[in-house]
């Protein structure tokens, strides 16, 4: 069950058709109603991801975050490029200027201003909480039960066509012309902003029961076609034996 995984739908289209008989008229001038064509199979035309919200499951980690909505986290890849993900399995690592929020692979997570999210050395990462808007909160010395915002916010980004994002592996996605440019929820105008849930992770949106039924259906269809070919071969063999 890959965190933040989105199910994929495969689309097919037909290949060339063999024309056995074109639409024409018979000897007495009557129009024949249909053509006679034989299909030569099909091939994959596209594979699209279904960006439907997955279930949100509680974890025991305060650095796990689930997005409720259409947003994506932004991270900096090893090549310096910006990637996007729905996998909020994060943690704080020691940085030169304090503590950096990063993915489980050590990739820096972007803040709402587009920079790497780094806590100053004066903060204790274990005391950080995050509200639904992504603001990082820290308890004051006077009142530990009333944490206040420290001016840092986890960045959330949206796309006009998320199905156009390019999958690069490790749950990372890259912006393409088909997806459109990334829209920063904190700056750009979006239809509806996302919310964050601290201590939760988004599960895969694949319905196991449905996919198992589809798998069994496909298997039975394959067996049916295989038996039809076997039966046809047997009939042709018997027809050939009639001449002997």
Language-model region placement:
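Amphipathic alpha-helical polymerization modules
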Residues: 1-244
């Amino acid at each position: 069950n890959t965190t933040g995984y989105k199910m994929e739908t495969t689309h097919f289209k037909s290949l060339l058709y063999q024309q056995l008989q074109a639409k024409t008229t018979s000897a007495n001038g009557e129009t024949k109603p249909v053509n006679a064509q034989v299909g030569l199979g099909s091939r994959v035309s596209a594979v699209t991801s279904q960006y439907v919200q997955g279930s949100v499951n509680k974890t025991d980690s305060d650095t796990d975050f689930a997005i409720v909505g259409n947003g994506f986290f932004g991270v900096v890849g090893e090549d310096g490029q910006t990637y996007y993900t729905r996998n909020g399995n994060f943690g704080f690592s020691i940085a030169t200027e304090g503590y950096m929020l990063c993915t489980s692979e050590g990739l820096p997570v972007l803040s709402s201003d587009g920079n790497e999210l780094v806590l100053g050395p004066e903060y204790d990462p274990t005391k950080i909480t995050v509200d639904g808007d992504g603001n990082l909160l820290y308890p004051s010395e006077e009142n530990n039960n009333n944490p206040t915002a420290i001016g840092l916010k986890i960045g959330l980004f949206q796309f006009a066509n998320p199905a156009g994002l390019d999958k690069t592996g490790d749950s990372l996605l890259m912006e393409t012309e088909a997806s459109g440019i990334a829209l920063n929820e904190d700056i750009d105008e979006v239809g509806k902003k996302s919310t964050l849930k601290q201590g939760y992770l988004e599960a895969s949106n694949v319905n196991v029961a449905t996919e198992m039924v589809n798998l069994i259906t496909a298997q039975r269809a394959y067996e049916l076609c295989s038996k039809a070919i076997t039966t046809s071969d047997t009939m042709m063999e018997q027809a050939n034996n009639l001449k002997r």
